[in-house]
Amino acid sequence: MDLIKAVESQQMRKDLTPFNVGDTIRVHYKVIEGDRERIQPFEGIVIKKSGSGLRETFTVRRVSYGVGVERTFPLHSPRIEKIEVIRRGKVRRAKLYYLRKRVGKAATKIKELM
């Protein structure tokens, strides 16, 4: 095992819930405003997972007041408090960019995994 992989493996988090593209998740993210620190939940559909190891990221999309909001999180960030899987989704694509073109209820409609 080379030196970079050894250092990365120490910093990777093992306490996170596994999830896939198409799942509806709630990410509890630590936000620091001045000297205060609070936890801000962000709920939406996972439209993309990319990278591997310590550099792995995922993008969550939700529609808020008719406007699509996407947020990309580093998976192994210490600012992520926890990840809750609300619904498991069944999709046949690795990237769900087609949801960006949809409006209304169709933007959040994904088959549920039983």
Curated annotation (Swiss-Prot):
Give the UniProt record's GO annotations in the biological process aspect.
translation
Q: Which SUPFAM superfamilies match?
A: Translation proteins SH3-like domain
Q: Which UniProt keywords apply?
A: Ribonucleoprotein, Ribosomal protein
Spell out the InterPro entries in the cross-references: Ribosomal_bL19 (IPR001857), Ribosomal_bL19_CS (IPR018257), Ribosomal_bL19_sf (IPR038657), Translation_prot_SH3-like_sf (IPR008991)
Q: Which residues form a coiled coil?
A: none
Give the source's domain of life in one word: Bacteria
Transmembrane intervals: none
Q: Would you tell me the Gene Ontology cellular component terms? A: cytosolic large ribosomal subunit
Q: Which PROSITE patterns match?
A: RIBOSOMAL_L19
Q: Which family, according to UniProt?
A: Belongs to the bacterial ribosomal protein bL19 family.
Question: What role does this protein play?
Answer: This protein is located at the 30S-50S ribosomal subunit interface and may play a role in the structure and function of the aminoacyl-tRNA binding site.
- Which protein, by its recorded name, is this? Large ribosomal subunit protein bL19
**Species for this entry:** Thermoanaerobacter pseudethanolicus (strain ATCC 33223 / 39E) (Clostridium thermohydrosulfuricum)
Q: What is the lineage of its organism?
A: Bacteria, Bacillati, Bacillota, Clostridia, Thermoanaerobacterales
